[in-house]
Design a protein with these regions (language model features):
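HIT superfamily nucleotide-processing domains
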Residues: 1-129
Length: 129
């Protein structure tokens, strides 16, 4: 797609790649090392990829995690996908966010991705069982 920022990635931006996916640094990182893993085929949803391409994408996610664990000594990772407008997807080319985390980067990391709906995030507290 000519207007898609992920369809025509410039080679210098690519950190890692395989036959079906490429990894690049996020241009608006929420943490140092925030990386996007993007299928080379233009699809809006990861679920529209053939199984072989989904598998290759997730293998690349694992390689990115391994690389970041060594390079920036991440203590953990938040890995996520915004699939569809209702989920917050702003670039309609599927991609996976790999966000390195450090102990102490937020006051209380419990709940992780549950914070997308703040009223549901503190499931471990009384009254949320």
């Amino acid at each position: 797609m000519p207007d898609c920022p992920f369809c025509l990635l410039e080679k210098p931006r690519i950190l890692l790649e395989n036959d079906f996916a490429a990894a690049i640094s996020d241009r608006f990182p929420v943490a140092p090392g925030h990386t996007l893993v993007i299928p080379k085929q233009h699809v809006a949803s990861l679920f529209d990829l053939p199984q072989e391409e989904q598998s290759a994408l997730w293998r690349l996610v694992a390689l990115v995690r391994d690389k970041l664990k060594i390079e920036i000594a991440a203590d953990g990772f938040t890995v996520g996908v915004n699939d569809g407008l209702a989920a917050g997807q702003t670039v309609m080319h599927a991609h996976v966010h790999v966000i390195p985390r450090r102990n102490g980067d937020v006051a209380d990391p419990r709940g992780g991705v549950r914070w997308i709906i703040p009223d549901k995030a503190r499931y471990w507290t009384e009254g949320h069982a």
